[in-house]
């Protein structure tokens, strides 16, 4: 597969309502949903091409009342859903090429009221959504290439709220059930990339409320179900160097928050209602044990 690029650049002088920029780069995607029916799914996704998504918004004077810049890059994506039905699935996702999402706002001499800059990068992502449904799934994910979400914002004056976030996962699985759903699943996640990184950098002249956050996870599994059964066996293997880096500065500010989070393996489950829940985790190696590569931590605010 060849390289996949999705880029856009907006040059704004002055706008009243706001600016919206959305950029998505994705190599492979599959979506299967059933309503009042049953389905059996077999999916094999293999990405070998670089995936790159980039958004740049330049503002000379004013970004207006509410602006949003969203950038997403994903190697392989799968979405499975059942409403009043049953879905059985066998899904394999393999990513062996770099995935990068970069979103930035350049407004050093401009003002903005409310601003949102969100950047998401994932090597493999799979989701199972149920509404009074049931699912039996075997999902295997493997990524061997670097995954990066990066960028930031430079703004002269923020009169409202500015939220700038970066989220990265080598492998990601979300299982969500509602209205008396039931699920049985076996998940395997292996991340052997050199680097899995989320980084955001912000600089403000004057600001009212700001939040800068970076979240990086080698392998992530989240299970949430409202129903009688959730039986999940999870196996996670990570040898990647995982880095979360967030930096924020403001000359004058009302309230400012900067958070950074990094984890080699993460597994969370939330259950409600009568249930039987069995979850087994097998983390083999955490990323923190590795030394950072020479290129890790470099800023990427330049184009």
Curated annotation (Swiss-Prot):
Organism: Caulobacter vibrioides (strain ATCC 19089 / CIP 103742 / CB 15) (Caulobacter crescentus)
GO cellular component: cell outer membrane
InterPro entries referenced in this protein's UniProt entry, alphabetically: Holdfast_HfaD
Lineage: Bacteria, Pseudomonadati, Pseudomonadota, Alphaproteobacteria, Caulobacterales
Polar residues bias spans: 266-281
Ranges annotated as biased composition (Low complexity): 282-303
Identification of the protein by name: Holdfast attachment protein D
Membrane-related topology note: Peripheral membrane protein
Alphabetically ordered keywords of this record: Cell adhesion, Cell outer membrane, Membrane
Main location group: membrane
Chain intervals for the UniProt region annotation (Disordered): 266-303
Biological process annotations from GO: cell adhesion
Regions crossing the membrane: none
Domain of life: Bacteria
Subcellular location: Cell outer membrane
Encoding gene per record: hfaD
Biological role stated in the UniProt entry: Involved in attachment of the holdfast to the cell. The holdfast is a structure that allows the bacteria to firmly adhere to surfaces.
